Each structure stands twice: as structure tokens, then as C-alpha cells.
Amino acid sequence: YLPEANKSLRELNDKIERKVFENAKQYNTIMEYKAAMVALDNFVSDYPGTPYKEDALFYKYDSAYQLAINSVHEKMEERLNIAKTSYQSLIKFKPDTKHKKLADEMFARIETDLKNFTK
């Protein structure tokens, strides 16, 4: 019975992990970007070996990016820098990420917007 029980336990844990990821990602979908960043951070720390880590890091980056570009001017620079750090985390984890094209386009906008603050 032990191998069967272990298999069932593994399957249930995989389902829970997927559900936690989908719940965290949902915050991004409904444009609750601060909540998405926290939930995705928690997901990555709670499930360090997850197969969803690449996607979690991308959605955290996307949330940080969306929060930054939609911010009031006073908060924009700080949030752009947070988004930049999220991009670097994604690329450090997986340089050839499946989200690379979009991530690079978003990063170019971040760099352009940050230049406005250094003038």
C-alpha cells in the first residue's frame, strides 16, 4: 500500500501546488498587482522546486511592470526599479525564458521611463 499511498500523496500535492499558483496568477489577471506580487513571491518561496517557477517569476514581473507604468509620477521611479529587479530575477533564473520577447519589450519601456527620472 505504501507506493500507492505515496503516488496519491504526490498527485494531491501537485494539484495543490497548481491551485496555489493559479490563485496567485489570478491577482494579476484581475489587475490587483500589489496582491499578485505578494502572492507570487509567497508561491515561489513555498514551492522552490516548482515547475511553475518560470511563469510565477514572469507574472510577478508583469505585475510589477503594470503597477509601475500605471503609477502616479511620485511613485513611478521606485516601482520601475522594482520591476527592473523582477526582470533581472526572471532572466537570472531562466535566460532563455519562453516569455523573453515580451519581457524584453517591457524592459525596454522600463529603461526608457527610468531615463526620464535621471534628467
Region annotations inferred by a language model:
Residues 1-119:
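Acidic, polar-rich low-complexity tracts and alpha-helical solenoid repeat scaffolds
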